[in-house]
């Protein structure tokens, strides 16, 4: 929490043309529109950096719950897209998901304070579901950790409970 190390870079589709092109690439946008049933926009883009042996994970959360509490997103009509930048294995911090959890709205514990995003990337203690709710979802649906080669695309419902694991390599 007290480190000055950069963990995430936001709005990357505004920072570099390569990410701008990627955000508009039909191989991505057509799949998103197929899932959503129509048009789309980029609500948030970012790169999460998790160096070997040091890269920390994030707590379980739902993107929708965060976007709803912090940005005012009114409805769960969004898709989260994760493009793997390096080969992803079980040991180097893959995103873990609770498949099926998107069918349930799991509220975070307590209110989310204004400007919480500034602290949440250092240590995420607010804006996360209760251990009881997580246990219930994991017991019912299990945990998946998709892996794959660099360039692989993972699309998931914005309400899916997920959390990236630590990079142990």
Label every model-predicted segment.
Residues 47-54, 64-65, 84-90, 100-104:
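Short acidic/polar capping segments at secondary-structure boundaries
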Residues 55-62, 69-71, 91-97, 106-110, ...:
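A short secondary-structure junction signal
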Residues 88-161:
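Double-stranded beta-helix
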């Amino acid at each position: 929490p007290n480190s000055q190390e950069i963990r995430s870079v936001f709005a990357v589709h505004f920072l570099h043309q390569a990410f701008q092109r990627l955000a508009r690439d039909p191989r991505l946008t057509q799949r998103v529109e197929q899932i959503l049933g129509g048009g789309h926009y980029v609500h948030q883009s970012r790169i999460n950096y998790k160096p070997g042996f040091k890269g920390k994970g994030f707590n379980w959360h739902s993107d929708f719950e965060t976007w709803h509490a912090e940005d005012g997103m009114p409805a769960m009509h969004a898709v989260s897209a994760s493009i793997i930048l390096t080969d992803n294995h079980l040991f180097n911090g893959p995103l873990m998901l609770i498949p099926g959890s998107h069918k349930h709205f799991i509220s975070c514990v307590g209110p989310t304070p204004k400007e919480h995003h500034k602290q949440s990337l250092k240590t995420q203690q607010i804006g996360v579901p209760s251990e009881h709710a997580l246990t219930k979802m994991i017991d019912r649906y299990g945990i998946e950790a998709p892996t794959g080669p660099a360039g692989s695309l993972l699309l998931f419902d914005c309400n899916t409970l997920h959390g990236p694991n630590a990079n142990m390599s």
